[in-house]
Amino acid sequence: MSTTPASQALVTVPPVRRRLLWTLGLGAFGLAFSITTTAAYLPPLLHRFTSSGGLIGAILGAEGIFALTVSPVVGPWSDSFHTPLGRRRPFMLVAVGPMGFCLLLMPFMPNLWTTVVIVMSFFFAYYLFETPYRGLYPDVLPASTFGRSQGIQHIQRGIAIGIALVVGGLLFKVWQPSPFILASILTTAACGLTILLVREDGGHGHVFEGFWAYIQRSWHIFWEDGDVRRFLLANSAWEGAFAAARTFVVLYIIDGLDQSKVLSSAVLGAVATGYVIAAIFAGRLGDRFGLARVIFFASFIYGGGFLAAGFAQEWHDWYFGFITAVSIAGGTVMTLAWGLLYKIVPVEHRGAVSGLATTTKGIGLLVGAPLAGLAIDLSRPYLSATNGYQVLWPICGALILGAIPLLVRLMEIEPRSKTEVPLL
């Protein structure tokens, strides 16, 4: 037989291809490690300067503003930025140093406002790196590997999150600045290796067209390309659900179900386990059966699981199996989402659309968590058994299930390459 099934491709692809997939994923490792460290250990540091939970939440939530403002400019700019170093890597190179430097300084700031300046600078550098990094994938990989490449990327993301939470937590108890120092070293090394080891086509004569021109181009694509618009709307729903769940899951377990912090850590471990399992297998399934199709069916389990969780008012140990299964479905959706975007976006607009997709992440950060928080406050008098927290899950479920109709059209137009994987 002259073709190679995508489900076997991870075994049969030559070492050069495997190395490229894992080398690209190092960027995701660095990004995940840095943002997880910031989200987990910055609030205790800020608590030294303020007791206002609202202010601390606003500082962390400002990440969404940078996703909304930086990405639509940097994405299309990188499409036209032709240099001997390539289109994407110059932006990544500019960002990697400030990311590491800000992480290193973050725990040593003497007051709230200097800390805020460093945190905002980190968020700016983070999205300056992430947007062209996302656009680098379709530039250097064939479409037949998009599913597996995202699976490998999310395996590395899962490893980074696990190390940041477990090892970082132990280090934080010993010396509070130590997780940030570790994050600075690993983020700089991992992201730097991606820049160093990945090669993209060079060029000459880059032209800066102006920030407003790039913003206009991004939103012109949004309104003119219906398929890209469908994906971006679906991605907003996925990111909104993820942001809401990430923000309130621990409070749901501790305050809503009256359980210990130890149990909440165990639940997060079950979620991480499901995420890694999905990352291992989702890419192969997506390349074989179609990314949109796999996301479509996984969304029913993902969203349906959230809806079912809304009925829980007390803890049972069998929830661990349920949580792991739903996490596998959710991890499948999140793993394959960017691979699907890479398949449907026009080649000349990859950077711009990557910027728009990152912008939808910002919308999720700015809308998903506050909306869920407001719903919890309003539901508290009526859902007293869980202090209102159980309303979180139907909201997340509605967002996931609401995106399913958008996938029907994407299943029809997704380029199919399951029968053959080029052995380059």
Where does each model-flagged region fall?
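Short amphipathic helix-loop junctions that connect adjacent transmembrane helices
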Residues: 40-55, 247-263
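Multi-pass alpha-helical transporter architecture, strongest
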Residues: 107, 189-198, 394-424
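Intracellular juxtamembrane helix-capping segments at the cytosolic ends
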Residues: 128-141, 332-346
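Juxtamembrane intracellular "pre-TM" segments in multi-pass secondary transporters
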Residues: 2-17, 201-233, 423-424
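Helix-to-loop junctions at the C-terminal end of transmembrane segments
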Residues: 71-85, 278-290, 376
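A membrane-interface helix-boundary motif in multi-pass transporters
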Residues: 87, 170-185, 374-399
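C-terminal ends and interior cores of transmembrane alpha-helices
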Residues: 93-110, 300-314
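Glycine-rich segments within core transmembrane alpha-helices of 12-TM secondary carriers
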Residues: 147-169, 360-369
